[in-house]
C-alpha cells in the first residue's frame, strides 16, 4: 500500500494541473447537481416495525379520513391585555384567523377553538388544531409562510399568535457556525507550521472536500428521501478530518524536505508513509459510520453513510489533490521565517512523555479517576427526541409550546392517539367505552375524548391528553400503561388497542435507539480490537486502546448530561434549552469518537512500534513516538475541537449537543487517553505491551502502516542506481 501511495503522490505532483483540474470539475459538476437536482429534506423520524408506526399504517388502511401520519400544526392564540377571547370583538378576530388558515395551501381542516372548546379557563388563551393534506415531509416553506401570514391581521389587532407542531419545523439551516472553527484551525495551523502556505493547504483541501461531499448529499436528496439532519454530521466530520489528514501529510512533507529530499520525492515519501496512516485512520472512521446502518434506524443510517462518503472524499483528496497542490507550493510550505531546530532542548512531546514515564502510576491513577468522576452524571441520562419544548427560546414553536402549556397544561402539546381495532369485537362500541373508561382511570391522564369510529365501524380513535409534557418520564410511563391494557381489553371484548401520535412515535424511537446502543458499542469495540491487533501486532495495545475509548465515551456522556440535561454551564456555553438527551446522540458519538480515537492511536503508536521493531527499548520507543508525533496530534486535536465547538453556537439544541459532545469527546480522548493514559500504560508494561502469541503473529495479515515496504523499495532503488553508476 505504501509503495502504491508513493507512486500516486509522485504522479499527482508531476501532473498537478491535470489532478487539480479533475477535482475542480468534480466540484463544479456536483455543485451544479446540488443547485438543480436537490430535493426537499424532512424532519420526520420513523422506525419501521414500532407499535406507533404500525398503528399509523393501520389507520391509513382502515381510517383514511383520520389523515394519520399527515402534518399537523397547533396555533396558540392569546388575547391582548384586558381582553378575553369570549368578548364578541375578540371572538370575531379569532374566527377570522381560523377562516384565513382554512384557505392556506395544503390545509385540510382547522378545529375552531370555540366549537372544540379549546379555550383556557381564564378565557385568555385558545388553541386551534390544523391538519394538513400531506405528511410533514411534503409541507413546503411556502406552505409554512402562508400559515404564518394568516395571523398578520390578528397580530395587528394586538393578539399573540404562535405556531407549533411538526408542520412548522422545517429544515434546519446548517449555519455558518463552522466558520468559528475554521478561523481557530487557521490560527493553530499557522502556529504549528510557521508558514501561511503550509497552514492554508489543509484548510483549502478540507473546504474542497466538504464542498464535494455536501454537494453530493444535496444532489442525492433529489432521488432519495433524506432527513434534514443528514448533512450535519457530514459537514462536521468532513471539515475536521479533511484538515487533520492534510495536516499529517504536510507535516511529513516538511520533514522530508528538511532531510534534504527534493520536493517531488518528499511528496512521494510523505504520502507513502503518513498517507498509509491516513488510509487506515480514514478506513476506521468509514467502517464505524457505515456500521450505523446495522442499527436498523433509517436516519442514523443516512447520517452515517453521508458522513462516511465525505470522509472517503477527504482521504482521496489528501492522497491525490494535496500532493498536486504541494507541487504548486514546492518549498514554500517551509516558510521564510520557519523556526530553526533548537539544539539540545527536547521537544514538548518528548518532555511530556518522559514526565509521564517517570510518574506513570500517579499519572495513570489521576487520569482514570478523573474520567470516572466526569462520567458520573451519565448514570442519570434520559433519552428523547427534539420537541417544540427544546426549540430555540425565540422561535415560534417554543413560544407556542409555552402558551399552550400555560393555558391547558404541558400534556396538550403531546396528545396520544389510541387506536381501537374492533374488527373481532362482538360489540365495537362497548369495547371502545371499556377502553376509554380504563384509560381515564390511569395516572397522569388529564382528559380522554369520546371514541370516533370510521365508516365501517370497526376502528375507533381516542385522544388522550397527559398531564405531563411529551418528553417527561410520566408520559412515557403512561404510554406503557395504556399498551398494557391491550391484552386485558382483547380478552374481555375482542378489541385490540395501540397507541400512536407524534409523542408515542418519539418514545418508540428513543427506546429503539437506547436498545441499539449497547450492541453497536460491542460491535465497535470488537472491531477496534481486531483492527488494532492487525496494525500493531499486539494484544495489550488494542486492549488498552479500546478500554481508553470506552473511558472517553462514558466521560463524554457524563459531560453531555451535566450540560444539556442538568443545565450546568449553559450560560457560559450559550445553551438555551435543557431536557432529555437526543436519542441519536449516544450512538452517533460512539461511531464518530471511535474513528477519531483510532486516528490518534495510529498516529502516535505507529512511530512507537516502528522504533521498537528496529531495536529501541520499549520505554524509549514511547518517548520517540511522542517526540515525532505529539506536536502534530495536539494540533490535529485542537483543530477538531475548534471545528466541533463552533457548532455549539448553532440555534438548534440538537446541533449544539452534537457539536459539544464531539468537541468534548475529542478533548478527553486526545489529551487524557492518548496523550496521558497511553504513555503511562506503555511505560508501565514496557516490552510486555508488544506481546503477541507466535501462532497469532503468523495468522495476522501484515498491513505495514509504518511504511516499511516503501523503505525497502527506496533502498533497493538506491542500490540499483549506485550499481549502475
Specify the residue positions occupied by each region the protein language model found.
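Structured non-transmembrane domains adjacent to transmembrane bundles in polytopic membrane proteins
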Residues: 49-72, 81-165, 380-570, 580, ...
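Membrane-embedded transmembrane helical bundles of large multi-pass transporters/channels
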Residues: 1-39, 107, 123, 131-383, ...
Amino acid at each position: 500500500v505504501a509503495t502504491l501511495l508513493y507512486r500516486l503522490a509522485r504522479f499527482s505532483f508531476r501532473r498537478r494541473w491535470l489532478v487539480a483540474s479533475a477535482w475542480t470539475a468534480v466540484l463544479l459538476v456536483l455543485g451544479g447537481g446540488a443547485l438543480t437536482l436537490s430535493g426537499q429534506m424532512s424532519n420526520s423520524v420513523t422506525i419501521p416495525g414500532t407499535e406507533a408506526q404500525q398503528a399509523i399504517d393501520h389507520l391509513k388502511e382502515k381510517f383514511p379520513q383520520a389523515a394519520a401520519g399527515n402534518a399537523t400544526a397547533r396555533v396558540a392564540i392569546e388575547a391582548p391585555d384586558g381582553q378575553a377571547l369570549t368578548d364578541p370583538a375578540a371572538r370575531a378576530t379569532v374566527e377570522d384567523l381560523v377562516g384565513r388558515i382554512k384557505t392556506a395551501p395544503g390545509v385540510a381542516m382547522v378545529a375552531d377553538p370555540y366549537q372544540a372548546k379549546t379555550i383556557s379557563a381564564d378565557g385568555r388563551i385558545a388553541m386551534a388544531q390544523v391538519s394538513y393534506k400531506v405528511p410533514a415531509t411534503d409541507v413546503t416553506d411556502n406552505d409554512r409562510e402562508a400559515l404564518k401570514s394568516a395571523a398578520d391581521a390578528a397580530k395587528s389587532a394586538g393578539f399573540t399568535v404562535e405556531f407549533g407542531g411538526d408542520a412548522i419545523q422545517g429544515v434546519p439551516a446548517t449555519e455558518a457556525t463552522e466558520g468559528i472553527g475554521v478561523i481557530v484551525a487557521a490560527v493553530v495551523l499557522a502556529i504549528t507550521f510557521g508558514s501561511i502556505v503550509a497552514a492554508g493547504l489543509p484548510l483549502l483541501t478540507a473546504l474542497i472536500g466538504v464542498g464535494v461531499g455536501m454537494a453530493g448529499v444535496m444532489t442525492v436528496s433529489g432521488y432519495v428521501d433524506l432527513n434534514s439532519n443528514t448533512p450535519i454530521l457530514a459537514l462536521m466530520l468532513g471539515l475536521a478530518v479533511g484538515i487533520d489528514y492534510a495536516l499529517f501529510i504536510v507535516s511529513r512533507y516538511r520533514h522530508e524536505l528538511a532531510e534534504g529530499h527534493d520536493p517531488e520525492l518528499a511528496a512521494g515519501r510523505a504520502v507513502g508513509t503518513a498517507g498509509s496512516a491516513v488510509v487506515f485512520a480514514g478506513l476506521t472512521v468509514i467502517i464505524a459510520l457505515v456500521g450505523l446502518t446495522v442499527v436498523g434506524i433509517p436516519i442514523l443510517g443516512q447520517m452515517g453513510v453521508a458522513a462516511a462518503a465525505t470522509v472517503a472524499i477527504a482521504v482521496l483528496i489528501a492522497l491525490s489533490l494535496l500532493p498536486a497542490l504541494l507541487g504548486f507550493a514546492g518549498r514554500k510550505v517551509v516558510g521564510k521565517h520557519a523556526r530553526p531546530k533548537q539544539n539540545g532542548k527536547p521537544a514538548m512531546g518528548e518532555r511530556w512523555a518522559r514526565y509521564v514515564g517517570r510518574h506513570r502510576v500517579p499519572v495513570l491513577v489521576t487520569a482514570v479517576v478523573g474520567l470516572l468522576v466526569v462520567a458520573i452524571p451519565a448514570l442519570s441520562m434520559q433519552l428523547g427526541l427534539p420537541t417544540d419544548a427544546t426549540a430555540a427560546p425565540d422561535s415560534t414553536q417554543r413560544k407556542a409550546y409555552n402558551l399552550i402549556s400555560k393555558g391547558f397544561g404541558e400534556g396538550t402539546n403531546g396528545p396520544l392517539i389510541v387506536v381501537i381495532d374492533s374488527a373481532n369485537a362482538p360489540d365495537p362500541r362497548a369495547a371502545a367505552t371499556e377502553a376509554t373508561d380504563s384509560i381515564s382511570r390511569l395516572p397522569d391522564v388529564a382528559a380522554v375524548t369520546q371514541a370516533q369510529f370510521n365508516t365501517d365501524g370497526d376502528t375507533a380513535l381516542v385522544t388522550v391528553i397527559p398531564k405531563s409534557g411529551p418528553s417527561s418520564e410520566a408520559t412515557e410511563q403512561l404510554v406503557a400503561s395504556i399498551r398494557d391494557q391491550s391484552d386485558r381489553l382483547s380478552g374481555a371484548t375482542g378489541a385490540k388497542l395501540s397507541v400512536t401520535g407524534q409523542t408515542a412515535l418519539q418514545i418508540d424511537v428513543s427506546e429503539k435507539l437506547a436498545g441499539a446502543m449497547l450492541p453497536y458499542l460491542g460491535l465497535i469495540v470488537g472491531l477496534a480490537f481486531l483492527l488494532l491487533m492487525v496494525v500493531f501486532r499486539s494484544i495489550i495495545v488494542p486492549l488498552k486502546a479500546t478500554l481508553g475509548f470506552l473511558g472517553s465515551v462514558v466521560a463524554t456522556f457524563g459531560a453531555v448530561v451535566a450540560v444539556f440535561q442538568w443545565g450546568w454551564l449553559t450560560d457560559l456555553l450559550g445553551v438555551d434549552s435543557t431536557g432529555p438527551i437526543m436519542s441519536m446522540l449516544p450512538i452517533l458519538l460512539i461511531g464518530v469518537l471511535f474513528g477519531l480515537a483510532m486516528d490518534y492511536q495510529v498516529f502516535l503508536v505507529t512511530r512507537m512500534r516502528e522504533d521498537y521493531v528496529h531495536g529501541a527499548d520499549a520505554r524509549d520507543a514511547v518517548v520517540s513516538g511522542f517526540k515525532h508525533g505529539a506536536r502534530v496530534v495536539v494540533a490535529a486535536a485542537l483543530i477538531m475541537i475548534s471545528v466541533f465547538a463552533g457548532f455549539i453556537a448553532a440555534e438548534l439544541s440538537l446541533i449544539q449537543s452534537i457539536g459539544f459532545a464531539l468537541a468534548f469527546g475529542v478533548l478527553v480522548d486526545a489529551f487524557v487517553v492518548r496523550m496521558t493514559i497511553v504513555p503511562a500504560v506503555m511505560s508501565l508494561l514496557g516490552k510486555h505491551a508488544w506481546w503477541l502469541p507466535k501462532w497469532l503473529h503468523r495468522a495476522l495479515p501484515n498491513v505495514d502502516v509504518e511504511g516499511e515496504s516503501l523503505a525497502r523499495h527506496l533502498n533497493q532503488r538506491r542500490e540499483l542506481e549506485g550499481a549502475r553508476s
